[in-house]
């Protein structure tokens, strides 16, 4: 009997797997996949839950991989939800709950597709599923741990599809062939505290920070590249910790986030930020320090065999030719791309991370059909 992706999605939503809790989600999937003949291994690292599953021969020349996550973001105010966020309730044509869109429906669809495919038409090759419980958190011991373990064990994927939600409005509209890089810069300006009536006796870190922020925000990083929109810089915090209106504080902190295309690297942007900070410091006499966190570099899987395989399957099942895009935030594809070519395709993601997160039930079975067709075409 075919594996029902709708029922599996509901079962997964009922698992309260808020990062870093496993919540029973990977235990459920491991049982299903083991019963279907997959070789399953828990690859937990530093308490972070991860699941590896392979059907077929280790080291096969053609190995198709799926990647996804079962961890979810916190519910927030549970009283604000129309339905139980971990109830997996189906009502009004929707399946409700935290993770319904991001991305338990995607995981359920590719698990169901893989199980049905290998049982109905066993391929000459292998199918690997890598599913983590650490995508919404720090992403340090999740997919990276799985890929590290695979390298040690001689396991490899030839290509990989990440089942994150990718479509803006309708299933089939968009797939991701790359992602922008992301980095966060933390600035600390240290001046000299003083009375606001005597500004000449102080060194105002707020004024210095404002000058720096104005320079950064008004600078055009680029005009975009062949497959990427222009890079963006957003100021996300400015803080002095100063409740007094007649005191010039000694300290001011600010944070900016940069989403960057393939014209830049995290290192090149840090060099630019350091130069800008040094120039403002020289102009104002205020010391400005910088630390930065690079969450991921930009990457691109150039249009080719893998993207065409996915596009054909999507068009065959939905009638829509998916637009190849690099928009949006980061995903674990940024880690997979160092292992093998990777493309992302999944459901409409309009309600992910929101109160009353939900997925249209009528989309889940078609997503399974798309994934199953991709497998069939890949191994034909």
UniProtKB/Swiss-Prot annotation:
Binding note for cofactor: Binds 2 Zn(2+) or Co(2+) ions per subunit.
Cofactor requirement: Zn(2+); Co(2+)
Top-level taxonomic group: Bacteria
Binding site for Zn(2+) 1: 69, 102, 164
Keywords: Amino-acid biosynthesis, Cobalt, Diaminopimelate biosynthesis, Hydrolase, Lysine biosynthesis, Metal-binding, Zinc
Residues the record lists as binding Zn(2+) 2: 102, 136, 353
EC number: 3.5.1.18
Gene Ontology MF: a single term: zinc ion binding
Function: Catalyzes the hydrolysis of N-succinyl-L,L-diaminopimelic acid (SDAP), forming succinate and LL-2,6-diaminopimelate (DAP), an intermediate involved in the bacterial biosynthesis of lysine and meso-diaminopimelic acid, an essential component of bacterial cell walls.
NCBIfam families assigned to the protein according to its UniProt record, in alphabetical order: dapE_proteo, PRK13009.1
PANTHER family: ACETYLORNITHINE DEACETYLASE (PTHR43808), N-ACETYL-L-CITRULLINE DEACETYLASE (PTHR43808:SF31)
Name of this protein: Succinyl-diaminopimelate desuccinylase
Organism expressing this protein natively: Cereibacter sphaeroides (strain ATCC 17025 / ATH 2.4.3) (Rhodobacter sphaeroides)
Gene: dapE
């Amino acid at each position: 009997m075919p594996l029902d992706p709708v029922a599996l999605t509901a079962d997964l939503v009922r698992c309260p797997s808020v990062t870093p809790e496993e919540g029973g989600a990977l235990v459920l999937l491991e049982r299903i996949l083991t019963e279907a003949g997959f070789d399953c291994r828990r690859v937990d690292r530093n308490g972070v839950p991860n699941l590896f599953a392979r059907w077929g021969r280790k080291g096969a020349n053609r190995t198709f991989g799926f990647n996804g996550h079962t961890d979810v973001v916190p519910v927030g105010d549970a009283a604000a939800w129309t339905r139980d966020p971990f109830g997996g309730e189906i009502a009004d044509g929707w399946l409700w709950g935290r993770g319904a869109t991001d991305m338990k429906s995607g995981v359920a669809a590719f698990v169901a597709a893989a199980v049905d495919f290998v049982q109905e038409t066993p391929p000459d090759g292998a199918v690997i599923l890598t599913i983590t419980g650490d995508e919404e958190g720090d992403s340090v011991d999740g997919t990276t741990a799985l890929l590290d373990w695979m390298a040690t064990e001689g396991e490899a994927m030839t290509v990989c599809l990440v089942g994150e939600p990718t479509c803006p409005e309708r299933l089939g509209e968009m797939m991701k062939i790359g992602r922008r890089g992301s980095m966060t810069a933390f600035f600390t300006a240290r001046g000299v505290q003083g009375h606001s009536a005597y500004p000449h006796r102080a060194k105002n870190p707020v004024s210095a920070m404002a000058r720096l922020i104005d320079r950064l925000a008004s600078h055009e990083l680029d005009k975009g590249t062949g497959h990427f929109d222009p890079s963006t810089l957003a100021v996300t915090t400015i803080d002095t910790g100063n409740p007094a209106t007649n005191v010039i504080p000694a300290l001011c902190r600010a944070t900016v986030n940069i989403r960057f295309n393939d014209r830049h690297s995290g290192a090149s942007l840090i060099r630019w930020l350091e130069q800008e900070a040094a120039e403002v410091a020289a102009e104002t006499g205020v010391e400005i320090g910088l630390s930065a966190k690079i969450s991921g570099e930009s990457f691109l899987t150039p249009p080719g065999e893998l993207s065409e395989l996915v596009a054909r399957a999507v068009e065959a099942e939905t009638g829509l030719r998916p637009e190849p895009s690099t928009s949006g935030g980061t995903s674990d594809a940024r880690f997979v791309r160092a292992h093998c070519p990777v493309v992302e395709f999944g459901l409409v993601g309009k309600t992910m991370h929101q109160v009353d997160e939900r997925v249209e039930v009528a989309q889940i079975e078609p997503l399974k059909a798309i994934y199953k067709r991709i497998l069939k075409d890949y191994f034909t």
